[in-house]
């Protein structure tokens, strides 16, 4: 198998590390961010900080990419001589992007398109794309790559510390009563995606510092006795970014068998639903 004949298509909600996007020459399908009077393209003409700066005046909506955008990207891939495509998207339980890709893919009879529903979001999904790139770079055959990626879905997890419930409530992710009660008690939820790929609150911790520590401990628990894994730190905004160095040091101490630690700002589309201050701790098990 010639690895040059396999292309990569990922969505912006997967927060694939920029270095991997460049190495794999990946095409990124952008989600949409919609305000009352204008529409932006995720990570193209709007940043996460832009979203945070405007949250007080307006909370935008997010939208999946258009079929036309996906069609154009697949046409480009085809014109570049690729025969196979690995497409990695955030959970179908959180977005219609995965289904949209599958529908559009049916039009391309000459392309062998394998679409991965990661059942995850953010870098939790992006770590699956890292694995896809790695398998292709290693020269694994097509069927083996597909099998391994399907297995990897259960091996990748991210735990989000969310500093306020306000934006999850306004975005319809949690109820108003839960939001008011949580904020009154200074409870910080730890959110992940469950096996069905939908948001699941796995803990509620009083105070931000303890909440971040809990996210780390949950990542440690998920890694278990694994012999090797990738780690990731996702952050939302400047305040969260200032905590990354300390979190990195803690992860190195508690999870020393890591192969690589990826770090990055969450996409603007994800920031819409969480607000600033989010910290995500991701793990992808490489060797159980």
Predicted regions mapped to residue ranges:
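Mixed-charge interfacial surface used for oligomerization/domain docking
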Residues: 2-7, 13-27, 32, 38, ...
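Class I S-adenosyl-L-methionine
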Residues: 38-100, 104-107
């Amino acid at each position: 198998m010639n690895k040059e004949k396999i292309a990569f298509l990922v969505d912006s909600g997967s927060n694939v590390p920029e270095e991997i996007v460049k190495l794999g020459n990946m095409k990124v399908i952008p989600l949409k961010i919609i305000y009352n009077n204008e529409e932006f393209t995720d990570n193209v003409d709007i940043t996460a900080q832009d979203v945070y700066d405007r949250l007080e005046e307006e909370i935008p909506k997010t939208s999946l990419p258009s079929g036309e955008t996906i069609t154009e990207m697949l046409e480009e891939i085809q014109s570049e001589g690729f025969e196979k495509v690995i497409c990695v998207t955030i959970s179908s339980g959180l977005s219609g992007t995965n289904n949209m890709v599958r529908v559009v893919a049916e039009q391309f009879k000459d392309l062998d398109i394998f679409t991965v529903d990661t059942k995850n979001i953010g870098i939790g999904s992006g770590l699956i794309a890292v694995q896809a790139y790695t398998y292709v770079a290693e020269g694994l055959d097509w069927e083996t790559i597909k099998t391994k990626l399907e297995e990897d879905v259960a091996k990748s997890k991210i735990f989000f510390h969310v500093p306020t419930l306000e934006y999850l409530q306004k975005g319809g992710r949690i109820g108003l009563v839960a939001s008011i009660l949580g904020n009154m008690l200074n409870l910080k939820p730890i959110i992940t995606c469950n096996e069905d790929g939908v948001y699941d609150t796995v803990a509620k911790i009083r105070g931000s510092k303890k909440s971040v520590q809990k996210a780390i401990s949950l990542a440690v628990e998920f890694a278990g006795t694994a012999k090797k894994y990738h780690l990731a730190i996702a952050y939302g905004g400047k305040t969260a970014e200032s905590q990354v160095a300390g979190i990195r040091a803690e992860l190195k101490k508690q999870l020393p068998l890591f192969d690589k630690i990826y770090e990055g700002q969450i996409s603007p589309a994800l920031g819409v639903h969480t607000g600033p201050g989010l910290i995500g701790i991701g793990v992808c098990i490489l060797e159980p």
